Amino acid sequence: MLDIQFIREHTDIVKESQRKRGESVELVDEVLSSDTARREALKAFEEARAQQKEIGKKVASAPADEKAKLIAETKELSQKVSEYKSKADSAAEEYTTAMWKLSNIVEPEAPEGGEDDYVVVKKVGQIRDFAAEGFEPKDHLTLGTGVAGIDMRRGVKVGGSRFYFLRGQVARMQIAMLTMAVDQAEEHGFTLAITPTLVRPEVMRGTGFLNSHADEIYRLREPDDQYLVGTSEVALAGMHENEILDLGNGPLRYCGWSSCYRREAGAAGKDTSGIIRVHQFDKVEMFVYAKQEDSYKEHEHLLAMEQEMLAKVEVPYRIIDTAAGDLGSSAARKFDCEAWVPTQGRYRELTSTSNCTEYQARRLNIRERMEDGGTRPVSTLNGTLATTRWLVAIMENHQQKDGSIEIPKAMRAYMGGKEVIEPTKWEA
């Protein structure tokens, strides 16, 4: 949610942000109109109620010949107060509905355009020349099946399309990768949290995911009415809902470990083979509560954390600055790290980190205590540190001619010193 005072004073900035996102500019006028109607209705209600109270005070001491008249006026005003209250409540509801539709204000530095209009910030690492090495690279599913580590057939049998089993050493590789991510986060002062994967509608709505991603989210209907999270960002944002935080000693930094669920509603025909685009996966997510003035510095820190982790798994990658039209409703700025996938001949997203400024905090009523005793909304930020999809890039970039997979050096200590995952015969 945005600050209504900012919208009133900087209407052009908010409209420009909506335009850059490809969203309704007219919505800003709707917000301002409903704000005016809300304030006028509230003023009328408060004036009528004050008048009612004033007359009520006079009734007790009024002479007998005036008392009946005053009582009649009180009853008439009571009816008006009730009507004004109803109008004020209705106006407030319309205002809130309009406000909650507005997306966060895009940072001026974010590129213009849509999904394909990102800007490449930099590329890191050398892409392997498999032709020079004398063999054609196998895709991650072929490799994973060959080492008895990915079982799509039985995953589909159990859960339906886009489900899978991770087995044996590939399952161990995922645990190793996620554990290594947690260790790195803790070294940087993050607190580990294993988070709920079911959340209340108010929390999901508060994070902004029901604005543009509602069709991607699994929902449990009555009598439960809960949502399955697609990232632990949701639970970590909701953890301090309706709280006043002490950020005097610096930001609150969490890393959440959770299973995640996504419907992939708009992904028909995309990445139907393997584990790139699936309904369930595991992820370690960073989440930060920071002072407003520290959010940009914290965003850079999260991106640096992601790069540190990518260096450990030794895959070529690039960083892109996501265009305004491809941002989620909560994000003011977002950077993605995309790893090179040899068999696809292109980069695929492994991480994203977003600065949500005060947008989520306003919606969830999360504030910080100021030195003067007052409060103000905090900034929230998030970033991926490791997830199941990383296995795709690791396996394909570390494959050997015989179908084995070399384990990245930094991960070996997490896999009992094992250096290579060898092909295995099994009934796939």
From Swiss-Prot:
Gene3D superfamilies: Bira Bifunctional Protein, Domain 2 (3.30.930.10), Serine-tRNA synthetase, tRNA binding domain (1.10.287.40). Keywords: Aminoacyl-tRNA synthetase, ATP-binding, Cytoplasm, Ligase, Nucleotide-binding, Protein biosynthesis. GO terms for molecular function: ATP binding; serine-tRNA ligase activity. Pathway: Aminoacyl-tRNA biosynthesis; selenocysteinyl-tRNA(Sec) biosynthesis; L-seryl-tRNA(Sec) from L-serine and tRNA(Sec): step 1/1. Disulfide bonds: none annotated. ATP binds at residues 262-264, 278, 349-352. NCBIfam families: serS. This is Serine--tRNA ligase. The lineage of its organism: Bacteria, Bacillati, Actinomycetota, Actinomycetes, Bifidobacteriales.
